């Protein structure tokens, strides 16, 4: 992982969006790598899915009603969710642990 506060990556394609990983998200991912690698791999699957199709696909994507505007979640486990915000040019990954 990079030492930058927000690690940025780009994808290729007609609607390429930049991926921004917030510090809390990176901390959550480190937790999964240390405690449950299967869940960590699921996080990477969901990231790939979100980057391809932010509003449909695996993990039962659903818009969040009571969080910030444009926030979506996908089911990571029965208890935990991956939360992200989609804008025109980027996808911000906010957290991947706990239920919102």
Kindly give the residue locations of the regions a language model identified.
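Basic, Lys/Arg-enriched alpha-helical interface segments
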Residues: 1-79, 86-100
